Amino acid sequence: MSAVNTPAGFTDYKVADISLAAWGRRETIIAESEMPALMGLRRKYLAEQPLKGAKILGCIHMTIQTAVLIETLVALGAEVRWSSCNIFSTQDQAAASIAAAGIPVFAWKGETEEEYEWCLEQTILKDGKPWDANMILDDGGDLTQLLHDKYPQVLDRVHGVTEETTTGVHRLLDMLAKGELKVPAINVNDSVTKSKNDNKYGCRHSLNDAIKRGTDHLLSGKQALVIGYGDVGKGSAQSLRQEGMIVKVSEVDPICAMQACMDGFELVSPFIDGINHGTEASIDKALLGKIDLIVTTTGNVNVCDANMLKALKKRAVVCNIGHFDNEIDTAFMRKNWAWEEVKPQVHKIHRTGPGDFDAQNDDYLILLAEGRLVNLGNATGHPSRIMDGSFANQVLAQIFLFGQKYADLSPAQKAERLTVEVLPKKLDEEVALEMVRGFGGVVTQLTKQQAEYIGVTVEGPFKPDAYRY
């Protein structure tokens, strides 16, 4: 797609500035050259049109890389309506280029909470009425939740949802356990080519970039505390170590904690003896008083709570690279401390009280992206080559679920198919192979004898489902 002029009469969009479309198109063309798996799928399935008839409601960060995803879905036959899953993550030139191509999109950087909710609604509604959508592509679960809560009739036609991130998967599993989930879901997050690329290697690239853009600080020689050591935490700790920081890790899971130790990070707790009693007395003030940077990576609530924020070193930087803004207790900061905007998505939080502040006061914290996703709030997120794997998984998951035609099944068949599952390993390997080819790599093929010896086929899949990469 190369159009940059909005089709005559097309008004089914809202973006910051449609005149940015040409800029967005130029960046999209570059991104396509860095997304070999996604573009490979576009070429492979173009003639087949496996998404013909698919009407996809999409809610994922409206970035340049997402523009390539959207146009791949459309190229394979789908119609889409789109919004962003974060109020700060949209790249306005990307949204403009999609609108200029005649694709409904409702997203701009710096939305208010009310505007965010409005954009979600417009994704679902066409001409004021629910669109006859039959697929969902989500990141974080807000769109899926809104459909279940307010537009359940739409779900009668929906074949399934593909979910991008850890937080959204947790919400889906919770809904499934409570009997509230109405459609099957593919857990894209736990595909190897998503979790190991996006969550780990992506954060390794983009966290330090966002912090440096937001603060202009030299990070070398300073002390950082990374809260959480899952895939996002692992990538984040590596990102800061690359900058020469002295990195400590806090974890609740003994296995992840062991991995942090094995990777050479000091395992600590912000709480004395590791126990949070909800009081200032339980805080390890000696530890937090030396921390220059704290990063939350968990997808959990209040992992950097009010008592920790009180004990942090003066002028420490605080940020989050998990999906939602509740990992850091920003509600406490808004209620009790004064906020001074330095520039968009960078605030000095004066710990001298909620009222007026002295600009020369040195008892403040630097909060990035208001506690929301820092790498997209203060920078441009993961590079195209990283998102290539994630979005190739999304395309294959959409094709897979759309082909299952869940909405057309009998009640008995629906009950059997109502699951939250990962993408079949063979498709995960298909994405990986396209990515390897994009790097110019050559994968060695097993001989028939070798394949028989380890109990697989020459074409794969090569590992059992329980294998941990």
Curated annotation (Swiss-Prot):
- Its EC number(s): 3.13.2.1
Q: Does the keyword Transferase apply?
A: no
Name the keywords, alphabetized: Cytoplasm, Hydrolase, NAD, One-carbon metabolism
Cofactor stoichiometry and binding?
Binds 1 NAD(+) per subunit.
Instruction: List GO BP terms, alphabetically.
Output: L-homocysteine biosynthetic process; one-carbon metabolic process; S-adenosylmethionine cycle
Q: Which Gene3D superfamilies match?
A: Adenosylhomocysteinase-like (3.40.50.1480), NAD(P)-binding Rossmann-like Domain (3.40.50.720)
Q: What class of enzyme is it?
A: hydrolase
Q: Which domain of life is it from?
A: Bacteria
- One Gene Ontology CC term in the entry: cytosol
The positions annotated for binding NAD(+) are: 165-167, 199, 228-233, 251, 300, 321-323, 375
Q: Which GO terms describe its molecular function?
A: adenosylhomocysteinase activity
Task: List localization entries.
Answer: Cytoplasm
Involved pathway(s): Amino-acid biosynthesis; L-homocysteine biosynthesis; L-homocysteine from S-adenosyl-L-homocysteine: step 1/1
Residues at which substrate binds: T63, D139, E164, K194, D198
| CDD domains assigned to the protein according to its UniProt record, in alphabetical order | SAHH
Alphabetized PANTHER family for the sequence: ADENOSYLHOMOCYSTEINASE
Q: What does this protein do?
A: May play a key role in the regulation of the intracellular concentration of adenosylhomocysteine.
Q: Which family does it belong to?
A: Belongs to the adenosylhomocysteinase family.
The protein's name: Adenosylhomocysteinase
Q: Which organism is it from?
A: Pseudomonas fluorescens (strain ATCC BAA-477 / NRRL B-23932 / Pf-5)
Give the gene symbol: ahcY
